[in-house]
Amino acid sequence: MAVRKPPITTREYWAPGHAACAGCGCATALRLATKALSEAMEEKYGDPNAFAIAHATGCMEVVSAVFPYTAWKAPWIHVAFENAAAVASGIEAAWKKLGRKGKILAIGGDGGTADIGLQALSGMLERWHNVLYLMYDNEAYMNTGIQRSSSTPYGAWTTTSPPGKYSVGEDKPKKWVALIAAAHQIPYVATASIGNPLDFVRKIKKAGKIDGPAFVQVLCTCPTGWRSPLEKGVEIARLAIETGIWPLFEIENGDIWNIKIQPPGGGAKVYKEGNRVVRIEFKKPIEEYLKLQGRFKHLFKRPEAIEELRNQVKAMWKVLGVEAILPRPEE
């Protein structure tokens, strides 16, 4: 009888018993990422443990390292909110001097990456350190009280962007750090989502094997900050892809004219010119994604705000070179 090989290693680097909220999508992302990176190191260097982690202050750092305990089964350093990329750069330089082979994994949330740590990230990428930077994007400063970040999407409720008579909630468009990273013309940039775990694992393995800097921005659901059912995290993350809210793409060597778009699924029709995706007709409206999250509840009393978000999503796809057709619920 044939034995089916599991899609990912059974080795664990993220132990149970951590203090993350029930249904935390970021915990799922870090568990998968470390397992995938372990596989990449085994395939490239013959050593599954050939990596070390520099982890910025944030949700996942706090819940995984409540002194004197730790959930990490790999070399791991807790660093300041803003300097995961800088510390990872130093570790990489030391390993190079010692002749030690492997990959350094830097981990930061959207606050510690898109805002506070953006300068350190840019420097790390520009200096061409052999570091994989993983941005786990739950779209707000969840650890410190659900404050908005520059990665918070338009219309979302946070404690610092509360909706009201004169406010729609967050009134700025989302910052796509992956595109900023790609502007450094580094070997590899990708977006991912826990709603498509196999795609995420593939991208982490690919990023891990590359010589030089790599950047992966993964969407992680947060039931606490998103006011969503804790058991629906993966479903919500998948709907983000299927409605067009969250694009899955890869950019290699800064070639923004040859962005590799992954099909969103969900019944969407994808049109290509050669190998390049030029048009996607989405079947599911963005309302299917929004309605499962309390942070967007107020938008259903403001149809003009939902329309503005729809236009922002179209504009984001246009930057990627894709015409996005986003349906409305009645269509």
From Swiss-Prot:
Cofactor: [4Fe-4S] cluster
Keyword tags: 4Fe-4S, Iron, Iron-sulfur, Metal-binding, Oxidoreductase
Cofactor binding, note field: Binds 1 [4Fe-4S] cluster per subunit.
Highest taxon, organism lineage: Archaea
Binding-site list for [4Fe-4S] cluster: 21, 24, 59, 222
SUPFAM superfamilies named in the record: Thiamin diphosphate-binding fold (THDP-binding)
Its EC number(s): 1.2.7.1
NCBIfam families, alphabetized: PRK11865.1
InterPro entries, alphabetized: PorB-like, THDP-binding, TPP_enzyme_TPP-bd
Catalytic activity: 2 oxidized [2Fe-2S]-[ferredoxin] + pyruvate + CoA = 2 reduced [2Fe-2S]-[ferredoxin] + acetyl-CoA + CO2 + H(+)
GO molecular function terms noted in the UniProt entry: 4 iron, 4 sulfur cluster binding; metal ion binding; pyruvate synthase activity; thiamine pyrophosphate binding
One matching Pfam family: TPP_enzyme_C
Name of this protein: Pyruvate synthase subunit PorB
Assembly and binders: Heterotetramer of one alpha, one beta, one delta and one gamma chain.
